[in-house]
């Protein structure tokens, strides 16, 4: 009798372990299958979170004084792992404005500097001393080549830009209008 109970307990433990392992493998499989979709959802959510409409003029002024990384060589490629890692670090990013190209349906936050996380969710300034509305205003971001609607995320819409389109930048004080005069492919 006691031998049957012992076997029954061992079987229950074994079944529980198998069920936990199977559940883990199913979750891992789903994460791998929906890898780019998960990345895209996080990117869209954070891009919306940092839109210029979500930030006050005072926050923008304060963020303009923040230090930023302007080393273009330190920028890493966009990957799902990097986006997930950045999501878990939950930092407050220095929004200093917004960029919009209505014909391309592009609307992104502008962050100070070229930190990788900045470029995952919007555009980053390339030079520390540039001033919005004065001459050229250099920005960088990523282009995405895979996933649903990849051509509509970050700087990917710029592949469809044409001469004569207008780019609008704002720091919530003024709106600056730039015209695209040359597109190099």
What is the predicted role of each segment?
Residues 12-185:
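Solvent-exposed, non-transmembrane regions of membrane-associated and secreted proteins
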Residues 1-15:
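N-terminal Lys/Arg-rich, disordered targeting/topogenic segments
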């Amino acid at each position: 009798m006691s031998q049957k109970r012992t076997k029954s307990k061992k079987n229950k433990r074994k079944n529980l372990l198998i069920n936990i392992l199977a559940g883990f493998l199913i979750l891992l499989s789903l994460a791998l299958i929906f890898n780019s979709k998960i990345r895209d959802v996080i990117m869209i959510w954070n891009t919306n979170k940092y839109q210029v409409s979500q930030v006050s003029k005072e926050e923008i002024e304060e963020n303009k004084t923040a230090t930023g990384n302007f080393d273009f060589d330190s920028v890493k490629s966009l990957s799902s792992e990097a986006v997930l890692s950045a999501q878990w670090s939950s930092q407050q990013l220095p929004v200093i404005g917004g960029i919009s190209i209505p014909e391309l349906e592009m609307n992104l936050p502008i962050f100070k500097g070229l930190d990788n996380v900045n470029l995952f969710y919007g555009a980053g300034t390339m030079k520390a001393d540039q001033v919005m509305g004065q001459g050229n205003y250099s920005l960088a971001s990523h282009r995405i080549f895979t996933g649903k609607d990849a051509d509509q995320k970050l700087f990917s819409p710029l592949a469809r830009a044409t001469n004569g389109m207008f780019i609008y930048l704002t720091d919530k004080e003024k709106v600056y209008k730039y015209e695209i005069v040359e597109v190099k492919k």
